Amino acid sequence: MKCVEVHVIDSSAIFQRKAVYRNMVTVPEVVAEILDEASALYFSVKNFRVEEASPESVEEVKEAARKTGDIHKLSDTDIKVLAKALDEIKKGNEVVLVTDDYAIQNVAMSLGIRFDGILHRQISKEFKWVKVCRGCGRRIESEICPVCGSEAIIRRVKNDKNRNSG
């Protein structure tokens, strides 16, 4: 199979009407988010393919998002956009995920998916997020600390990964 450059498009690219690539694909969940008339018109005149993401890739994305700590920041649509990018990579295509969403970019980086921002600078480092107790500072999994009963907050774990090649 011939390697093709494919741009997987997040809804932000459609809302900004900045998706101007030759080979564009998105998922049905993104199409469902298009509510304004200008974006709907833009979407209808561009040559988008709309395809489902595979359940296997959805699970891979969820696992990666759990590892980075972004799982609670991603919508089902975000997860499926990332999964579609993985599907295209598995087909042997050269993939660029087009999004301004930093959580999507972070998970994409952890999965080795190239990405481009639309209006905002893209991330250059991968971040890991963890829940910690607001009261005692312990790392926890739940929303309430089982030790002291305080609420969880999300904190970034510092690291120096700089792996985006896009």
Swiss-Prot record:
UniProt enzyme class: hydrolase
GO MF, one annotated term: magnesium ion binding
Binding site for Zn(2+): C133, C136, C145, C148
CDD domains named in the record: PIN_Nob1-like (cd09876)
Entry's transmembrane regions: none
Location of the region described as Zinc ribbon in the Swiss-Prot/TrEMBL record: 128-159
Function noted in UniProt: Toxic component of a type II toxin-antitoxin (TA) system. Processes pre-16S-rRNA at its 3' end (the D-site) to yield the mature 3' end.
Similarity-based family: Belongs to the PINc/VapC protein family.
UniProt name for this protein: Endoribonuclease Nob1
Species of the source: Archaeoglobus fulgidus (strain ATCC 49558 / DSM 4304 / JCM 9628 / NBRC 100126 / VC-16)
Lineage: Archaea, Methanobacteriati, Methanobacteriota, Archaeoglobi, Archaeoglobales
